[in-house]
């Protein structure tokens, strides 16, 4: 499971305390400040939707998975919001397959990878993991998995605040600094599920993390150099044969920061949070792997979010807000679930007619500037942002899924993209 470390210290303002537990919280309501309907889609307390870039939907787009209070996995019907348990016992979920309706996960008792069919409940053990190794990515045709492992020393433990693995720690930034400075030998490895063959893809002393296979190309893996975003060349892609190891976002200024990258649904683009420099100018950047074109959508600081996401057709984006935007001017104005409409036209003219030069060499790609037009959907004023909401669009674009402890316990919620029509 990809680590959800953000790269920014929580300064000036602290996250709100988790509110008191509300027994039988409302099933649905209309946010009085936005006019958008919110639905609590999980019944059991301390259930969570997945990390923002982990596929949680079945290939037909009709169901999604979530984690249960005891660490298992349940599946939710997106038409009725009814759910059923599919995997019991404490497991570590990875993703739902892109080709078959199977959920992939790891059982810690035997450190092995399993897959369970969400329709039939048929379960198969796929591979034993090497000592110290974890799996965090499954490729597009479900024939290969990728993971990381540290080969020397003891990596800094990921501290959490006690309620569940979705919560981040107050000392997260310090942990990241320590881990980056340790320069531990680590590697990305793959396992071919057809043959069981294990192979080392990369081995070095950079902090390798955040693995994501392309959703369409089974031979293409994205990974990152983890650490404070302004200290690392973060986003990379590599082929499963070890070739074409490529830096996606070369830094061009001091304190430039990029991270929380994710694939477009068609596998043609990589999107990510970009700040030039950190805490001053904010973008959601897109890089087209086929054409090498770059598009930077400017975003207001008051709408910056910990995570961004996009619909399958990339016509809409969303963000989960933040308790403290990065930079020296922290405030609480970002505590919203946001909807963003991307625009590359200003004053009636395409922005691409005034493209900026990116890089220094002849023939370098030019950046297509754009802008996000934001709309507030859910006020998250009672949410403790140590639990990151991790927004995800449903495949039909009608809802944004997120997790929250606004009622004390954690549940998964859905907010309707269209404004609700209030009843009498």
Whereabouts are the PLM-identified features?
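Blade/loop signatures of beta-propeller domains
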Residues: 15-39, 177-189, 360-367
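Asp-box/WD-like beta-propeller blade repeats and closely related beta-sheet repeat scaffolds
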Residues: 89-187, 196, 200-203
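Loop/turn-rich, solvent-exposed surfaces of beta-rich toroidal or solenoidal domains
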Residues: 273, 278-283, 298-372
């Amino acid at each position: 499971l990809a680590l959800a470390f953000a790269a920014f210290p929580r300064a000036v303002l602290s996250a709100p305390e988790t509110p008191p537990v509300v027994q039988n919280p409302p099933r649905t309501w209309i946010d009085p400040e936005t006019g958008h309907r919110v639905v609590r889609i999980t019944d059991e307390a301390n259930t969570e939707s997945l990390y923002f870039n982990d596929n949680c939907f079945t290939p037909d787009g009709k169901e999604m998975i979530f984690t249960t209070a005891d660490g298992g996995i349940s599946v939710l019907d997106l038409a009725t919001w009814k759910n059923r348990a599919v995997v019991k016992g404490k497991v570590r979920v990875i993703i739902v397959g892109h080709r078959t309706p199977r959920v992939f996960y790891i059982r810690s008792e035997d450190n092995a990878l399993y897959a369970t069919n969400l329709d039939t409940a048929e379960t198969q053990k796929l591979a034993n993991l090497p000592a110290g190794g974890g799996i965090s990515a499954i490729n597009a045709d479900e024939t290969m998995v990728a993971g990381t492992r540290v080969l020397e020393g003891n990596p800094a433990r990921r501290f959490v605040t006690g309620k569940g693995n979705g919560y981040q720690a107050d000392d997260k930034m310090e942990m990241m600094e320590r881990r980056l400075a340790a320069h531990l030998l680590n590697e990305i490895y793959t396992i071919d599920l057809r043959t069981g063959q294990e192979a080392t893809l990369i081995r070095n002393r950079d902090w390798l993390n955040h693995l994501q296979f392309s959703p369409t190309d089974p031979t293409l893996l994205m990974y990152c150099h983890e650490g404070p975003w302004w200290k690392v060349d973060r986003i990379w892609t590599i082929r499963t044969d070890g070739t074409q190891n490529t830096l996606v976002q070369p830094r061009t200024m001091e304190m430039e920061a990029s991270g929380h990258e994710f694939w477009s649904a068609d596998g043609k683009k990589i999107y990510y949070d970009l700040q030039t420099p950190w805490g001053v100018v904010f973008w959601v950047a897109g890089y087209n792997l086929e054409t090498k074109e770059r598009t930077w959508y400017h975003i207001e600081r008051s709408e910056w979010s910990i995570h961004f996401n996009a619909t399958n057709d990339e016509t809409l984006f969303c963000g989960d807000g933040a308790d403290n935007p990065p930079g020296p001017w922290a405030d609480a104005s970002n505590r919203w679930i946001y909807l963003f409409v991307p625009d590359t036209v200003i004053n009636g003219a395409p922005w691409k007619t005034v493209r900026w030069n990116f890089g220094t060499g002849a023939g370098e790609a030019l950046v297509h500037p754009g802008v996000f037009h934001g709309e507030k959907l859910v006020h998250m004023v009672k949410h403790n942002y140590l639990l990151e909401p991790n927004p995800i669009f449903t495949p039909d674009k009608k809802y944004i899924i997120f997790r929250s402890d606004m009622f004390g316990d954690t549940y998964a919620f859905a907010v309707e993209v269209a404004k609700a029509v209030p009843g009498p």
